[in-house]
C-alpha cells in the first residue's frame, strides 16, 4: 500500500497536472494555485516518508535497559534544544526542496503547454530553446 502512495506522489509531482491548464484567469498565470498544489503534494509526500521512518525507528530501537549509548543519544542529552532545532531545520529544508522542485516541474510543463498553444509566456526564448527557470524567476520578482 505504501508503494502505491509513493508511486502516486511521484506521478503528481513530476508529471503535468491537467487541471492547471484551466487555471488561466484573464490570460495570466496564477502562481498561487501552483504553490498551493506544490504544498499539498509535499505534505502528502512528507507524511508517507515520516510514516516509513517512524516504522523503521520502532523496529530498530534498542531496548531501554541497554548500556550502549550512541553519539546521537549523547548529543540529545547534552543539548536537547539544539537537537530539536536541528531536526526541525532538516525537516523544513527538505520540505522547501520538495515544494520548490514540484513547483518548478509544474511550471515548466505549464509554460510548455502555453507556448505550444501560441500563448506567449514571459521568460521563454525561441520555440526550440525555452528557458523555464527564467519564467519562475520572473514570476517570483513580479
From Swiss-Prot:
Keywords on record: Membrane, Transmembrane, Transmembrane helix
Domain of life assignment: Eukaryota
Gene Ontology CC: membrane
Major location category of this protein: membrane
The keyword Hydrolase appears for this protein: no
A Pfam family assignment: DUF4668
TM regions (residue ranges): 3-23, 30-50, 91-111
Name the UniProt record assigns to this protein: Uncharacterized protein YIL029C
Species of origin: Saccharomyces cerevisiae (strain ATCC 204508 / S288c)
Amino acid at each position: 500500500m505504501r508503494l502505491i502512495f509513493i508511486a502516486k506522489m511521484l506521478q503528481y509531482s513530476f508529471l503535468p497536472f491537467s487541471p492547471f491548464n484551466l487555471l488561466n484567469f484573464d490570460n495570466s498565470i496564477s502562481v498561487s494555485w501552483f504553490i498551493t498544489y506544490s504544498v499539498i503534494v509535499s505534505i502528502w509526500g512528507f507524511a508517507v516518508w515520516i510514516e516509513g521512518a517512524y516504522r523503521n525507528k520502532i523496529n530498530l530501537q534498542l531496548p531501554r535497559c541497554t548500556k550502549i549509548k550512541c553519539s546521537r543519544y549523547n548529543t540529545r542529552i547534552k543539548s536537547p534544544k539544539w537537537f530539536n532545532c536541528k531536526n526541525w531545520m532538516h525537516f523544513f529544508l527538505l520540505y522547501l526542496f520538495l515544494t520548490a522542485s514540484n513547483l518548478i516541474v509544474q511550471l515548466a510543463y505549464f509554460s510548455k503547454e502555453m507556448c505550444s498553444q501560441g500563448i506567449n509566456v514571459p521568460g521563454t526564448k525561441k520555440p526550440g530553446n525555452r528557458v523555464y527557470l527564467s519564467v519562475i524567476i520572473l514570476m517570483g520578482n513580479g
